[in-house]
Design a protein with these regions (language model features):
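C-terminal substrate-binding/active-site "lid" region of AdoMet-derived donor-dependent transferases
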Residues: 124, 137-187
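S-adenosyl-L-methionine
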Residues: 92-125, 130
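Conserved SAM-binding loop of SAM-dependent methyltransferases across substrates and taxa
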Residues: 70-82
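Class I SAM-dependent methyltransferase core
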Residues: 65-66
Length: 187
């Protein structure tokens, strides 16, 4: 009999890809991305339902995504019928590598750049019709100022009728929900 107490994706799952400190495991029919020696869970393929709810049918035209993760949101955005292109900016080259190995996106409309998303938005002259920002792990008093920086940068890269959405963590404490949503009311 096993002495294991519960199942863990990194112990009981199959390692599919590794680059640097980024790893992708398949566990219970879903991909799991973790980063670092402490197995910091960064993304789970089952988040698709959350992305569908949050992003909905907003993606259209030229789209920008900040944060790649497993590419789940990328695939959803690219599945939207009005999307012409998707540029995804990911700061961690190891995340880009393991995503390519474990969950590749074979769509000529998709471009992945290894860069800091905030710097990219301030440096680029490109304009986008939709921006999705998903590069933070939680929403609280420490991350809200950074999220506000991304929201302001979206104003620079959005076309006049464009929309921006920030990833919403369902576990966000109630005291931060209103402030978070107010950041994404971009005019």
């Amino acid at each position: 009999m096993s002495s294991k107490k519960g199942l863990l994706y990194f112990r009981d799952g199959e390692l599919l890809a590794q680059s640097g400190e980024a790893r992708v495991y398949r566990f219970m029919d879903f991909l799991h991305l973790d980063i670092g020696p402490g197995h910091n869970l960064w993304a789970i393929e089952s988040e698709l339902e959350d992305y569908v709810w949050q992003i909905n049918d907003r993606p259209k035209g030229d789209c920008l995504e900040i944060g790649l993760g497993l590419g789940v949101a990328s695939k959803y955005i690219l599945s939207c019928p009005k999307v012409k292109t998707l540029t995804t900016v990911e700061i961690n080259k190891d995340v880009i590598e393991v995503q390519k190995q474990a969950n590749p996106i074979n769509d000529k409309r998709h471009l992945v750049l290894n860069a800091d998303g905030l710097i990219y938005m301030y440096a680029t002259d490109r304009k986008f019709d939709f921006v999705f920002v998903d590069c933070y792990a939680l929403i609280d008093e420490e991350t809200l100022p950074m999220i506000a920086d991304y929201s302001r940068a979206c104003e620079k890269v959005l076309n006049p009728d464009g929309e921006a959405v920030g990833w919403f963590d369902k576990a966000t404490p109630e005291e931060f929900v209103g402030e978070f949503y107010n950041l994404w009311e971009i005019k």
